[in-house]
Design a protein with these regions (language model features):
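A cross-kingdom feature that marks ATP-driven nucleic-acid transaction machinery
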Residues: 1-135
Length: 135
């Protein structure tokens, strides 16, 4: 089992790798021909309003009215914790929708080091990319 400091470094390094390969991510998503704005998004927690903090490190806002909310993680929680993790992603997607008042289609996009089998993926995950897709 890896030390927490190593896991934090590994996740950060993987995030930086992905952010340096956004053009390749767009290509693998099949959107390289679509005008896209690349950004991140976060919202601070507001306990008075009962709002949890939320963040997406990579957001691809497409000219064709679709937004990819990219979840970038080197590894995911163990399979017994995945349902709660998928629920958290749904809540973050809805937080984004409320905070931005967007009418665009929101697609959850998962970028991880290793591919999950289709049974482990939540039905809400529209796209999945792996480390191999970046090279």
């Amino acid at each position: 089992m890896a030390a927490p400091s190593f896991k934090a470094w590994r996740d950060y390094a993987f995030l930086q790798l992905c952010l340096h390969h956004v053009e390749r991510i767009e290509e693998k998503l099949g959107i390289s021909g679509v005008e896209t704005t690349v950004c991140s998004w976060s919202r601070k927690a507001d306990p008075a309003q009962g709002l949890a903090g939320a963040r997406f490190d990579l957001v691809l806002v497409r000219r064709d009215h679709v937004i990819h909310l990219c979840e970038i993680r080197y590894s995911l929680p163990p399979s017994d914790l995945l349902p709660a993790y998928w629920q958290e992603l749904r809540e973050r997607r809805e937080a984004f929708r409320r905070a931005t008042s967007t009418k665009k289609a929101l697609q959850l996009t998962l970028i991880t080091a290793h591919r999950l089998d289709s049974q482990a993926l939540a039905e809400d995950i529209q796209c999945q990319l792996t480390l191999d897709d970046l090279f």
